């Protein structure tokens, strides 16, 4: 009995506790990411942004949460009620479940599986089903058009993201996210005789793929300038136009969880994860999770700057960029990286 408890029950309890702790921390972080997005957007427009609830508006997201929770959900008369309510739940659960394999620091991961990046790629591909369900079940033309746009957009840019992952796999030889970070201890900088630093991270050696992944991440998460599925000037609010109260909040939560995931993946694949910018003793004292958070916040800041300065693409421009530019370019980079690795004997 004792062996059964120590072998099965105790690890399950520990994993559930870790999952709940990660979930709470993630939800709080998403609340402040949403606040930061609004603050940055306001600063660009020379406004103050949310500044009433709490000091400097720090509790604004929690006030919005309470507002949504206490509102009555309204279901359109011709909507499929079950699918209409299930759609936001599917979206948010899939978005949150991907975080189980994301290492926030060395050893700070719930499930350190050897196909971590493949797991994230598979689960994030399923998130479009929640959007399609919501658009179809609303029984309205604007949500349905937004859902169709989202499906086409995500399929188009997932191909490029897949080729980016292949290039990283060729360089590292593993799909484990922890191994990908540890492989960036050495790289282009150490080959030139320099100490371990940010020059060893993949952003420099795989710079074209870094740019492709960054832009594809914007399209994958429906962020501007690729927010065609919820373009306010064309589709009002897109697939969310018939949603309000808690279901709308769950859609927004799933969207920002996916944004945070893409920022974290960019950090892991190209910015060295939890590694310090320079391998010196004073920077090594800083906990790895601090470096990870700083890098992820920097990537999100770049996401917000793109939203502020780049106008929305037309739908034909969006498709052309994905299929005629990123797809052949990423495929060519896979061939070039494989050729260089084989030529130099690093494969």
UniProtKB/Swiss-Prot annotation:
GO terms for cellular component: plasma membrane. It is found in: Cell inner membrane. It catalyses: a quinone + NADH + 5 H(+)(in) = a quinol + NAD(+) + 4 H(+)(out). InterPro entries: NADH_UbQ_OxRdtase_su1/FPO (IPR001694), NADH_UbQ_OxRdtase_su1_CS (IPR018086). One of its GO terms (molecular function) is quinone binding. The chain crosses the membrane at residues 13-33, 50-70, 82-102, 115-135, 161-181, 198-218, 263-283, 286-306, 321-341. Its main location: membrane. GO terms for biological process: aerobic respiration. It is an enzyme of class 7 (translocase). Its EC number is 7.1.1.-. It is a multi-pass membrane protein. The keyword Disulfide bond does not apply. Keywords: Cell inner membrane, Cell membrane, Membrane, NAD, Quinone, Translocase, Transmembrane, Transmembrane helix, Ubiquinone. NDH-1 shuttles electrons from NADH, via FMN and iron-sulfur (Fe-S) centers, to quinones in the respiratory chain. The immediate electron acceptor for the enzyme in this species is believed to be ubiquinone. Couples the redox reaction to proton translocation (for every two electrons transferred, four hydrogen ions are translocated across the cytoplasmic membrane), and thus conserves the redox energy in a proton gradient. This subunit may bind ubiquinone. NDH-1 is composed of 14 different subunits. Subunits NuoA, H, J, K, L, M, N constitute the membrane sector of the complex. Belongs to the complex I subunit 1 family. HAMAP family: NDH1_NuoH. This is NADH-quinone oxidoreductase subunit H. The gene is nuoH.
């Amino acid at each position: 009995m004792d062996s059964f408890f120590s072998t099965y029950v105790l690890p399950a309890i520990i994993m559930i506790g870790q999952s709940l702790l990660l979930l709470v921390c993630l939800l709080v972080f998403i609340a402040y990411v949403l606040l930061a997005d609004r603050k940055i957007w306001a600063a660009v427009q020379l406004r103050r942004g949310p500044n009433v609830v709490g000091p400097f508006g720090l509790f604004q997201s929690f006030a919005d949460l309470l507002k949504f929770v206490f509102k009555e959900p309204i279901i359109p008369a011709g909507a499929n009620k079950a699918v209409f309510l299930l759609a936001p739940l599917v979206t948010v659960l899939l978005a949150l479940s991907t975080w189980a394999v994301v290492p926030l620091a060395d050893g700070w991961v719930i499930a350190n599986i050897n196909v971590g990046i493949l797991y994230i790629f598979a689960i994030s591909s399923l998130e479009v089903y929640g959007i399609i369900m919501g658009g179809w079940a609303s029984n309205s033309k604007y949500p349905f058009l937004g859902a169709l746009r989202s499906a086409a957009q995500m399929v188009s840019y997932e191909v490029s993201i897949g080729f980016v992952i292949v290039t990283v796999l060729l360089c590292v030889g593993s799909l484990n996210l922890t191994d990908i970070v540890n492989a960036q201890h050495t790289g282009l900088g150490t080959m030139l005789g320099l100490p371990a630093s940010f020059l060893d991270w993949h952003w420099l050696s795989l710079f074209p793929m870094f740019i492709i992944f960054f832009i594809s991440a914007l399209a994958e998460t429906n962020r501007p300038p690729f927010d065609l599925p919820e373009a306010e000037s064309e589709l009002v609010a897109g697939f969310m136009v018939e949603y309000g109260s808690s279901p709308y909040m769950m859609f927004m939560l799933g969207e920002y969880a996916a944004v945070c995931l893409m920022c974290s993946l960019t950090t892991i694949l190209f910015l060295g994860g939890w590694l310090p910018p320079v391998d010196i003793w004073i920077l090594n004292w800083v906990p790895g999770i601090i470096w990870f958070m700083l890098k992820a916040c920097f990537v999100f800041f770049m996401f917000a700057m793109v939203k502020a300065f780049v106008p929305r693409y037309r739908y034909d421009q969006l498709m052309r960029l994905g299929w005629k530019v990123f797809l052949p370019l990423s495929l060519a980079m896979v061939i070039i990286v494989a050729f260089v690795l084989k030529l130099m004997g690093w494969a």
